[in-house]
Amino acid sequence: MASQGRRRRPLRRPETVVPGEATETDSERSASSSEEEELYLGPSGPTRGRPTGLRVAGEAAETDSEPEPEPEPTAAPRDLPPLVVQRESAEEAWGTEEAPAPAPARSLLQLRLAESQARLDHDVAAAVSGVYRRAGRDVAALASRLAAAQAAGLAAAHSVRLARGDLCALAERLDIVAGCRLLPDIRGVPGTEPEKDPGPRA
């Protein structure tokens, strides 16, 4: 009876060692599961005040109390020249801004060159404008001559048209006169006409 009341122990599987990452055993799994149950399945009674934090396996996050690591100061390279700071007062800066820049002094040769350049520009502009004016006058005269010739041609065409109308009217009148039977024959000379035979006397 005692032997039957006892539970049979489960047979342990033979453990094999494999090179690489180690796996958890049954005892480790049971221990971790009991710890998680203690963590997450703790007393569920109502708690007041500040809530308790939960512990989670993993890397802990940084808090505000932990000081941030300050970057280490890097030494400046020795090849750079030393920095020189020049400070100017407000009065000096204002005075330099208000002072006008001195005009460069012009020599006599530069003045002569400027005068000759101005005269040359004036002469070139006058010559070009004179050429354009003469060409404009010539074109205007030619246009007026062409207009006069066109007017003369139109007048001659009108005169020819009137003469043609007069000739047509005269030809129509001559046709009327030639075709009329009521007028005497003007072609014969009087006295030379043949005598008409009188009819038989009764």
Curated annotation (Swiss-Prot):
The modification Phosphoserine is found at S65. InterPro entries: BLOC-1_complex_su-3. One of its GO terms (molecular function) is protein transmembrane transporter activity. Residues 61-71 have a biased composition (Acidic residues). The modification Phosphothreonine is found at T63. Residues 1-11 have a biased composition (Basic residues). Keywords: Albinism, Cytoplasm, Hermansky-Pudlak syndrome, Phosphoprotein. It holds the Pfam family BLOC1S3. Interacts with BLOC1S4, BLOC1S5 and BLOC1S6. Component of the biogenesis of lysosome-related organelles complex 1 (BLOC-1) composed of BLOC1S1, BLOC1S2, BLOC1S3, BLOC1S4, BLOC1S5, BLOC1S6, DTNBP1/BLOC1S7 and SNAPIN/BLOC1S8. Octamer composed of one copy each BLOC1S1, BLOC1S2, BLOC1S3, BLOC1S4, BLOC1S5, BLOC1S6, DTNBP1/BLOC1S7 and SNAPIN/BLOC1S8. The BLOC-1 complex associates with the AP-3 protein complex and membrane protein cargos. Interacts directly with BLOC1S2. This is Biogenesis of lysosome-related organelles complex 1 subunit 3. Belongs to the BLOC1S3 family.
